[in-house]
Amino acid sequence: MKALHFGAGNIGRGFIGKLLADSGIQVIFADVNDHVIEQLKTQRAYPVKIVGDRLNVIETVSNVTGVNSKNEADIIACFTEVDLVTTAVGPNVLKIISSTIAKGLSARFRAGNTRPLNIIACENMVRGTSFLKDNVFSYLTPEEQQQAEAQIGFVDSAVDRIVPPVQFDPANPLLVTVEEFSEWIVDKTQFKGTIPAITGMEQTDNLMAFVERKLFTLNTGHATTAYLGKLKGHQFVKDSIDDPDIREAVKATMQESGAVLIKRYGFDPHAHAAYIEKILKRFANPYLQDDVDRVGREPLRKLSYNDRLIKPLRGTLEYGLPNQHLIQTIASALAYRNESDPQAVELAQLLQQDTLESAVKKITELTESNIVQQIVTAYNALQKN
């Protein structure tokens, strides 16, 4: 079996690509990074360092190669022979690669390849593959769309593994460090043909419960740790979560978002409390030097209507649940400043150009004046400190 994976960065190599290769699948990495692709083509293997309380080992991932995304014809040619396509490029890049994927599918159809092909976007976004499908279909003819509906599975997934950037090592340019924990859950109802046997890929027919569990817990908690840590001058996530005041606030925020999950999906409260504790422990992993600016980057996206801060807040409003810690986290996200992050710069400009209430409504798309005013009050309190 052969897979084409878009994105040869840390997550691509350290998470999805590793699971595929470990399952005996030949992996072709597609990326614009010339150096990484040349290294993959030459070495056909790379090291992954796995770190945790019980583990600190380097494993070799083999049976891999690379193709340069700048040479679109080479990418398109891959579509005639692969059995699986995956991505780990970031939500903002999905739209960019959709035209290439559409051309690849067209080439596959023209070549007479009628075997089922499944595409899985492994991104930090809700229903990322469905978003990708909509963009891919915008480039296909009606006839190609009909053929794609019959042969191409667009499979939504939820992914969870902390993969921070590591200092470049000239002796091991492909080395990536990952935490021991990983979770990859796919919607089994969306596959075409036989579901591939991939170790570490879990199947479910209730994906949204797991998507929101991860978004409302791991992502919400991670963002909270970063934004509160930034305000107190911490550089790393571990330093932030080791701060007792921040740890207490992060836990309380995840408990508020967790109450929404328990109400919406019937999660067991004790099991979810244990899940929160596991995540707090992951944030404190001493082997992961994860910068708060990496975790807090792109604040406008993280403050958007369906993302990790506003969506759980909306859930508390829907079910009449407590939300004071979520409001404090949102205020701290609004206070995030980083001159090297274009979205952080734009965020600061938006808050200066308009009244705070109007800016918060524009950024979050929240319409309830009462909750917007509470966010504004919390933000103003932060500015005075």
UniProtKB/Swiss-Prot annotation:
Binding-site residues, NAD(+): 3-14
GO cellular component, one term: cytosol
GO biological process terms held by the UniProt record: mannitol catabolic process
Database matches in InterPro entries: 6-PGluconate_DH-like_C_sf (IPR008927), 6PGD_dom2 (IPR013328), Mannitol_1_phos_5_DH (IPR023028), Mannitol_DH (IPR000669), Mannitol_DH_C (IPR013118), Mannitol_DH_CS (IPR023027), Mannitol_DH_N (IPR013131), NAD(P)-bd_dom_sf (IPR036291)
Entry keyword set: NAD, Oxidoreductase
EC numbers: 1.1.1.17
Catalytic activity: D-mannitol 1-phosphate + NAD(+) = beta-D-fructose 6-phosphate + NADH + H(+)
Molecular function terms from GO: mannitol-1-phosphate 5-dehydrogenase activity
Family membership: Belongs to the mannitol dehydrogenase family.
PANTHER family documented for this protein: ALTRONATE OXIDOREDUCTASE-RELATED, MANNITOL-1-PHOSPHATE 5-DEHYDROGENASE
Protein name (record): Mannitol-1-phosphate 5-dehydrogenase
Organism encoding this protein: Pasteurella multocida (strain Pm70)
Source organism phylogeny: Bacteria, Pseudomonadati, Pseudomonadota, Gammaproteobacteria, Pasteurellales
